[in-house]
Amino acid sequence: MQPPSFSTSEDTVQPVSAASPIASDDASSAFVVAVPARYASTRLPGKPLQLIGDRPMIQHVADRALAAGAREVWVATDDARIAEAIQGLAGVRVAMTSSVHLSGTDRLAECARIAGWDAATCVVNLQGDEPFAPAAGIRAVAQVLQRSGAEMATLAAPVDSAHDLFDPNVVKLVRNAHGDALYFSRAPIPWHRDSFAGQRDAVPAGNHWLRHIGIYAYRAGFLQQFAAMPPGTLERIESLEQLRVLEAGYRIAVALTPEQFPPGIDTPEDLQRAQAQLASA
């Protein structure tokens, strides 16, 4: 295996259907994947290096990006231990970024500058705690961006339980008729006045409730704009960074994921479930 590269910083398209998911076997243009990874995690310290099977989590995430067919895969980190964990993983590069970034978006913007991507490059932001992210989903979010003409793209899935609908840790969203996001919220949106007045132990009929999947795509040029924008009022209230984009008047295209994304890993209990899932595979 070849060691990774280590770097430091010194035309109109058709709109995406709002009703249908992106087909997983559609041809797509080239895209790159960047994985923000930091060692400090309040609920699961050293999360990227936690073992799933006999390999650290960050290696599993990088594998998913490679399986999706990304032209380049980069891990953006400020921690030498995470960089070392990528050594020997063919096809993956490391961007050593600043330790003062306040968000993964800031870290990815620096990674894009280190990588030297031109403004039109399609960049997929794959979270570092998604070791089982489906390759079809990673490709799909790139396709959404490329076809929609929006500044940013993401994925969603139907809400299938009342628990998730009312759980503030499960982010919900609503779209317009063209498939663009109208709003993201920790609240159950849209609020079904009649159904919720009587009971809140089931998801009302109608397939109107979507939960957000935290994978994004943007052009490298817009990524720099996004990182430079000041936080918006709605972003501060909901603690959802993507609201900065909507509040500034930009589009976020949303499509249904072609394949289910397993939950990310945030806690020791999540890690145990991931280890059990791999063992049973």
UniProtKB/Swiss-Prot annotation:
Family matches, as Pfam families: CTP_transf_3
This protein's UniProt keywords: Cytoplasm, Lipopolysaccharide biosynthesis, Nucleotidyltransferase, Transferase
Protein family per UniProt: Belongs to the KdsB family.
Catalytic activity annotation: 3-deoxy-alpha-D-manno-oct-2-ulosonate + CTP = CMP-3-deoxy-beta-D-manno-octulosonate + diphosphate
GO cellular component terms, A-Z: cytosol
Record has DNA-binding as a keyword: no
Pathway this chain belongs to: Nucleotide-sugar biosynthesis; CMP-3-deoxy-D-manno-octulosonate biosynthesis; CMP-3-deoxy-D-manno-octulosonate from 3-deoxy-D-manno-octulosonate and CTP: step 1/1; Bacterial outer membrane biogenesis; lipopolysaccharide biosynthesis
Name of the molecule in the record: 3-deoxy-manno-octulosonate cytidylyltransferase
EC number of the protein: 2.7.7.38
Species classification: Bacteria, Pseudomonadati, Pseudomonadota, Gammaproteobacteria, Lysobacterales
NCBIfam families assigned: kdsB, PRK05450.1-5, PRK13368.1
Protein function: Activates KDO (a required 8-carbon sugar) for incorporation into bacterial lipopolysaccharide in Gram-negative bacteria.
GO biological process: CMP-keto-3-deoxy-D-manno-octulosonic acid biosynthetic process; lipopolysaccharide biosynthetic process
Predominant localisation class: cytoplasm
